[in-house]
Every structure is written in C-alpha cells, then in structure tokens.
C-alpha cells in the first residue's frame, strides 16, 4: 500500500511541477518560434539570420482585476485572491513563456486595467504598480536591448463619449504610457498606432479630430516602406465573418451604442465600416494588429490598394473569458527585400498559446484537495 501512496505522491508532485512551471516553458521549448526562422532562404539574399529581423512580442488585454471586475468589495479577501491568481499567471507567462524568446520589442495593444477610466488616482496607481511588477517593467527599462510600446484601449481611457468629457483620464494615461497616436519604425517596417476609441466619436470634439488629423498627416508621406496599423478595437467586418481555426468562442457581431444627445460612442466592439475604409485607404497597411475581443481572430480586408490581413490577438489573461490565452511573435525585416518581393514579405507572425490555467487547477490542484 505504501508503494502505491509513494507512486501517487510522485505523480502528483510531477504534475504540480508541470502545471506550475514546465507548462509555461513549453512555448519557448516546443510549441512556438520566431516566424522568420521558417521563411525561405531565398528571401534572405545573403543576409545573416540573427541580425536581419527585429523581433517583436505582441501582448494585449491583461485587464488587471480590480473592484470593478467582479463587483467585490475593495480589499476583500475574495478580490485579493482573484487578483493574486490572475497576476501570478500573467507574470509566469511573461517571464517563462515570452521573455525566453529574447524579443527586441514588447508591444502592448491596450486594456491594461479593468476599471482604468473610473478608478481613483490612488487605485489607478496601485494597478499601475501591479502592472509594472507583472511585466517586469523596471528590468525592461534598465535593459538597453528591449524597448516597450503601448497602445491605449477602452479600459484605459474609455470610449469617445467618456474620454471627451473626462480629459483628466486621458492625461493620467498619457503621463505613464505615453502618446495615444504615434508612429515608430522597426527595421524596415513602419508601425502606426491609432487611438481607436476616438475614431468614431463626434467629429466636433478635439480628441476625435486630433486622431483623424494624425491619420491624415501620416497619409501624406506614404512610400514603399511596409506599414503595420495598430488599433485596439478591431476593424469592421460583416456579421458572422469567420475568424479562422484559432478562434475558441463564437464570433461576436457588430454592436455599437451612441449617446442620444450628441451621437458619441458609448460602446463598440468594431470600428465602423466608414472609419475602417478610411483608415485602410489613408494608411495603406500591409497588416493590422488589434486586441479588444479577448479571443483570436484572423480575417482579410479588401481595400482599394489590395488585400490586408488583420490579426486580433487574444488576451494574455486566463480570467478574461478565453480558455486559451495567447501572445504573438512578429518578425519585422531589417534588410532590403530582393527585387520582386511583395511588401507582405517584410512581416511575418506566429500566434503562440499559453497554458490553460483552468485545466491545471482541475487536473493538479483539485486532486491535491482530495
């Protein structure tokens, strides 16, 4: 009997070790890799692999839990436990699943705190401290090898009807995370970050007009350099559009709500069709990256300049309605493409999945309790 007990104890200990540690190493050891490593050698044109791409890790929708998440009393034990387990999961995922890939860039696509727009300054700063700890921002800021870029989401500044009336929320966000509309270059690829929450707002508001002025200024210097459009809210698609094989939940159709008095946006899950068409025509991206939906989705838009792929990256949190949290690895070319190559050859992506925390609890921790 004691042999069976010892055997079961060893099996349980190994299962616990796998669920709490080794499972988070699987993406870097086995299931995921930088997409440029699989590109045809003919594209390399004699350039060394190690220096010919900028490596970008894309993360979205951590939505750190707070008093707005589960309607639990602030500082209650239940809320503290929920925060602890979600924070621990994301920190393990970041340190053990994402950082081992040694990315040059960390790109966040928005929604950092669940109740970001309505938290008090004290609560917001507390969430900011947790965010910095989870994603080890102090270490990243001290490293000369990793740069971090941020995109704002609706859980950061609210939708247009909110942030146009609460400019202090936007200022608070910008103080720590930086500008909402900006551009940057990685290798030979331009990235255009747009504040999607303001795109469909009242055109008379300063915050919406500022976003569109930025987009139009960007459109004035379009050249042959490939562009990636970054938008927290996904672009428009017709209802029931397939999201591809990585989707784990039903597709959500277009939903939009406007204020009666000024038609400002109260809620939306996609950018409107009009704004989508204008963005694609003015910016002319070869790729769009988005978040917001919490689940994975890949679709193709047809613009007047050709087909454009959009990847909606799933949430990195296990508590945001997606059993299969994910992140994305993106390789941006850092050399001149051979003649005859398309702009799409400059960018490649690979979706990577994180451990299913619920399965770990069921298979490892529940037997422990028994």
Question: Where are these predicted regions, by residue range?
Answer:
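Extended active-site neighborhood of metal-dependent phosphoesterases/phosphodiesterases
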Residues: 26-46, 76-77, 81, 115-228, ...
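Structural motif
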Residues: 54-56, 105, 189-191, 226-228, ...
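N-terminal active-site segment of His-dependent metallophosphoesterases
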Residues: 1-125, 130, 136
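Short, solvent-exposed loop/turn elements at domain surfaces
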Residues: 64-70, 201-202, 319-321
């Amino acid at each position: 009997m004691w042999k069976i007990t010892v055997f079961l104890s060893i099996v349980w200990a190994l299962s616990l070790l796998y669920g709490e540690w080794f499972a988070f190493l699987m993406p870097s050891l086995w299931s995921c890799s930088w997409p440029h490593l699989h590109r045809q050698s003919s594209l390399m044109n004699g350039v060394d692999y190690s220096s010919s791409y900028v490596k970008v890790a894309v993360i979205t929708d951590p939505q750190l839990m707070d008093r707005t998440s589960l309607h639990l009393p602030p500082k209650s034990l239940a809320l503290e436990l929920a925060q602890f387990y979600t924070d621990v999961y994301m920190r393990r995922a970041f340190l053990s699943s994402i950082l081992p890939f040694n990315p040059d860039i960390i790109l966040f696509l928005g929604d950092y705190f669940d109740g970001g727009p309505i938290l008090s300054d004290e609560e917001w700063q507390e969430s900011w401290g947790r965010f910095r700890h989870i994603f080890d921002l102090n270490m990243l800021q001290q490293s000369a090898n990793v740069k971090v870029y941020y995109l704002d989401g609706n859980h950061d500044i609210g939708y247009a009807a909110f942030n146009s009336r609460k400019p202090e929320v936007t200022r608070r966000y910008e103080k720590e995370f930086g500008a909402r509309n900006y551009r940057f270059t990685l290798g030979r690829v331009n990235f255009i970050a747009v504040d999607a929450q303001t795109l469909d707002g009242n055109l008379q508001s300063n915050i919406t007009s500022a976003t569109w002025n930025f987009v139009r200024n960007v459109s004035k210097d379009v050249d042959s350099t490939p562009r990636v459009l970054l938008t927290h809210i996904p672009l428009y698609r017709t209802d029931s559009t397939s999201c591809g094989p990585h989707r784990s939940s039903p597709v959500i159709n277009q939903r939009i709500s406007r204020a009666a008095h000024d038609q400002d946006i109260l809620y939306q899950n996609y950018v409107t069709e009009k704004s989508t068409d204008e963005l694609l025509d003015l910016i002319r991206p070869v790729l769009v990256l988005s978040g917001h939906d919490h689940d994975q989705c890949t679709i193709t838009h047809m613009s007047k300049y050709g087909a454009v792929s959009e990847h909606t990256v799933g949430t990195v949190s296990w508590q945001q309605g997606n059993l299969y949290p994910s992140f994305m690895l993106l390789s941006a070319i850092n050399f001149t493409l051979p003649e005859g190559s398309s702009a799409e050859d400059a960018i490649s992506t690979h979706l990577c999945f994180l451990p299913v925390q619920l399965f770990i609890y069921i298979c490892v921790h529940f037997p422990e309790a028994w």
